[in-house]
Amino acid sequence: MPPMLWLLLNFAAPALGFYFSISCPSGKQCQQALLSGNDILLYCNSSGAHWYYLFTQGKKGRLASLTNISNMEIMPEGSLLIKDPSPSQTGLYHCWNKNGRQVVQYEIDFQDISTLHVTHKDLGQRPLQNETLPLGSKELIFTRWEPWQDCNRCKEPGERKRLGYCYIEEPLKEAMPCWLYLGEMLVWSSRLRPELQVEACHVRCTNNTQLRVDYVIFDNFRLDEETEFVWLDCPLGSMYRPVYWHANDTPLTWESQLSGRDFTTFLDPSTGGRQLQVFQPAIYKCFVQQELVAQFNPATSPETLEAQWRENDAQWREARKALPGRADSVLKGLKLVLLVGTVLVLLGALLKFIRPSPGKRSKQVLMVK
């Protein structure tokens, strides 16, 4: 993607404040599984707040002040923005007010997006089955599903998705997100992974889900000459929001991609379809929460510009050839109009001369030159 396009996208989201956020009641401790690689806002309503963290993977440590971590930013109102979080940043996040009192505490498991298991319900693809953790005990690994997101289209057939997070449960104990449970333990299992499930949907249009933002048009995207593809990034799109793409007004669906029928584009599962890989020029439109937010127009190639120039030049030459004949026709038409006009003037004057107006006795002379 062109650097300017990335720059515009990076400025768009902070200005509009549309980061996906999670919140926790003041004074409470909340536990949440999320996905790595997807921006998140940890809510803390305390202006001038200080944040402390403790990453639970790796060596044991203690709470440290959150400074100089490149992908984290404390917002003016006190919330913590984490851009492109990594699995290694799984851990504890504490928000303290400027008086030194704890406002809220989060336990966050950033589950590895690169291991995401994707299925489509209408294709008969099945989610992961429950398994036992290979530790010799009876810990159960299972998927805890989030509610279905809104349908990505209304009035027309669309799709919706839901996220499933890896959880581990011991007998008679409350389940925990997998990597918060495992902490420093080095355990490998193909079952320790998050999930994404998609299904078809068809709903009526309402105003409840719309973002109510103006859409933006990006011109002149080009396919990379070496790779022959380019990535398009939908502003405000997120794994946690409904996203939908058009290519020349043709819907791009998860069902087509996961069934192997569509090879001209690729919806990136790790971003929930926010990023689209395209292999041919077209007009691409993206929608977030059923609302158009961006349109991407392809750049015109030099070959196309040259062909258009040649076509315009040929049309101009044809017009010049036809110009003399058209001029003669126009001249003849003008002469005919002048002749008819002269005759009408003479007839009008003659009628006035023959029948003068009542009450007027004057001599009228018709002069014809």
Curated annotation (Swiss-Prot):
It comes from the Eukaryota. It is found in: Membrane. This is Protein FAM187B. InterPro entries: FAM187A/B, Ig-like_dom_sf, Ig-like_fold. The chain crosses the membrane at residues 334-354. The lineage of its organism: Eukaryota, Metazoa, Chordata, Craniata, Vertebrata. The gene is FAM187B. GO terms for cellular component: membrane. It comes from Macaca fascicularis (Crab-eating macaque). Residues 18-333 are extracellular. Residues 1-17 form the signal peptide. Glycans are attached at residues 45, 68, 130. Keywords: Glycoprotein, Membrane, Signal, Transmembrane, Transmembrane helix. PANTHER family: FAM187 (PTHR32178), PROTEIN FAM187B (PTHR32178:SF8). Its main location: membrane.
